[in-house]
Curated annotation (Swiss-Prot):
Keyword annotations: Cell projection, Cytoplasm, Exocytosis, Protein transport, Transport
Cytoplasm is among the record's keywords: yes
Protein name listed in UniProt: Exocyst complex component 8
Pfam families hit by this protein: Exo84_C
Subunit structure: The exocyst complex is composed of sec3/exoc1, sec5/exoc2, sec6/exoc3, sec8/exoc4, sec10/exoc5, sec15/exoc6, exo70/exoc7 and exo84/exoc8.
Chief subcellular location: cytoplasm
InterPro entries: Cullin_repeat-like_dom_sf, Exo84, Exo84_C, Exo84_C_1, Exo84_C_2
Gene name linked to the record: exoc8
Source organism: Dictyostelium discoideum
Low complexity bias: start-end ranges: 494-511
Amino acid sequence: MKKGVTYPLKIDTNLSTVSSSVNYNDIECVDIKSNGHYIVKFMYREWVGPLNLMTTQKTSIKISIDLKEQTVTCTHTDKKKTVYRWGEFPNKKETEQNKKEDNPVQYETFLSSNFNSEKYVNDLFTHKTDQQATVHLQYLENRKLGCIDHLKKDVYKNHLIFIGASKEIANSEVDMLDFRNLISDYGNVMSSLQNISISWDHYKVKKSGKIDFEPLSPATEPIQWLTTAPNELSVSIEQREFEVAVGLVEKINKIYESNPKVEIVMQTHPLKDQIENKVKILTDKLMNELRSPLLKANQIKDTISLLVRLSQNDKAKSIFLESRSHSINQAIKKIVFSGDLNRFIGELARVIFNSINSTCNDFTNSFPSYMNSGLVSWIIEELVLISDIFNRQVFILDNFYSISQAIRIIESHCEMMDQTGLSIGFYWNLLLQPHVEQLIVNYEIKIRDSMLHQLMDEKWNGVSNWDYEVKSQLNSLPSSLKNSGTPNSGGSGISNNNSNNNNNYQSPIINNNFNSGGGNKKIGLTFQQMHQDNLNNMEDIDQGRLKLTSSTIFLNTIIQKFAIDICQIITIDLIPVISQSLGSIFKDYMSYLKNEIQKEYLSDTQCLAIISDSVYIVDDLVSRIATRFEDATGEKLNNLTQLSSLLYSYFESIRDQYSTRKALELVDNSMNWEEQEYQVEEELDPFPKNFIVLSEALDRLAESIQTNVNVESVLPIASRIISEIVNIISNRFESTSNLVFGYGGLQHFILEMKYLATFAGKYPVEDSTFELINTMIRNHKEIYLNNTSDPKPLKTEEYFTSIIDNLVYQKAVYN
């Protein structure tokens, strides 16, 4: 049924149980409400309700609408009904055809006494195909459903109507019996009244006589006063005499306490509701008074005192603190941010902390001490408000000096609150901690992103005039930071103390660009600017000991700026997150160096530049940055030992990878060493040419390492290369199992190995390397003796020693 549509109606005589003399031609759907109720116009009236039960005020008839059957049923008071239908009536021709349809079932068959159901079914389906059997079963199912529908309409429905009518008749009989009894009682009462005789003289009033009343007992006067208490309360409340009104309430409570029976009676007396209503009005009035921001301290105290006397402690506390929070929010909205962050934070702190101080004084003067926990919770909520403003206004800056100044402003107010007896500094630090930690983490992410961009453009060319010191203009720093360090720690937050540096490197001081307009600059841009300034200033710096690539110089710049910035806001509680951030930065960089040195296209100079970078980070930069944070807090970084060990393992891996690569290059390219040369029988020249070439190549490599890295790295790298060369030679002999040395080849091999052991002795080569050399000599001697039928005697030890001593002497004289 759609809104605004009129449906034409006709009476359905088949379903109607009563005829109607009036034929209503249509029904109109006026409106459909949101709750599912319909408004329809029918019988010149408006009907309201759900479709299954709609009523109107002008008649007792009820109607129901069936949208599926398209019928409107009018139920009268006598349970009879008139049914109207819109749309088409059921087709009578189809009904007659259904009656006349061919019925394959002979019902007389089931009446026979000899009826056998199994035989009947077998005979019925024996000559039928599957399709015919399916059609027959469908026919039986349709007949079954039709039978059920007829039962519902013709039997069960009439049965329910009959049961309902029987109940109505029974109820009517009971009502008639009650009515008859009432009539009988009324007749008896009237008869008794008519038989009463009254002596009217007895009831005549004597004019001269006075009626004496017994005076009220003092004990009953308070009870009598209760009847006037609501009026007195109303007058006091309207005249704003709240003290008097509260006194009346207390008087009522005393009457209840002294007269328990009165309290019991008042539980069901209307007077109690009147009194409670007046007390509620009084309480609401006092609550509204307490919400007013214009109240003075003594007025607040008096109002709260009245509410406490009314046993409204919790409500008074809640409303008092809520009103103070509202006034603080209104005051904050009036603060105008003109661009000066410190001024804005100072005004914000003044408003909030002054309100907290006055609220604490009013609260302690008005409420009992056991309710102070609610005050503490409220103070923490206000501190949360400040921390949220900090997160939105302060921690979005990149100027850490401005951030530290803003934090110091709040801390100074907390210190003033401590002097008044309210210690809230701990709560403030607790609320600020997550925001500062997130600030450090964001700083770390920016550093790692900037470092990655720098590494993508790295050519691995060491800068020859880099000496570990970055120039800065200390004049750009505030005077308080040049000597005293951070505002928070009171210590040397920016320290040049390098007592832990074994190489006597000077710690670079980064220009922090602390100016009033630096707060909105992007940190990545600041890093690039500082890095470019450092490169430009290198022309005036003396020759340094290490050559660093541009990415390491960049890392040195940004990591020291990170230390200077964080030292301005650092506390001991921030040590864990700082340790984690530093560890992530250094591990990422060293891991990148480790992966980069494995690339085959890098030249020898580029590989040494990578080693130089790793040496600088492991031996100098990490310890220098850790010392700076230790000077600022007095505490060491949590993971310094583990971080140093991990970074050193990265450094060793970088050095070993280079040594392995260089050893293979020397064996294949410089020495041109081949194991087949040792198969000759004739004696060779007693001159170990390949290993003399190796010795000279190692000397040149040592000079290159000293030039491109430092002196300290020469011996570890050279010794590692020698060990790798010995391993390569041993592995190649093992892979060539059928190799048999000739007499001359064996003599030459022994000479080369002894010469290799001689010049390897000036390097800190592992003992296992010398053992491997002796093992190879011994094994090949045994193989020669076992595979030669008439072996020649080998040269003595003195023979090889004299040749090697002569070669060493000639090299020393030549050099």
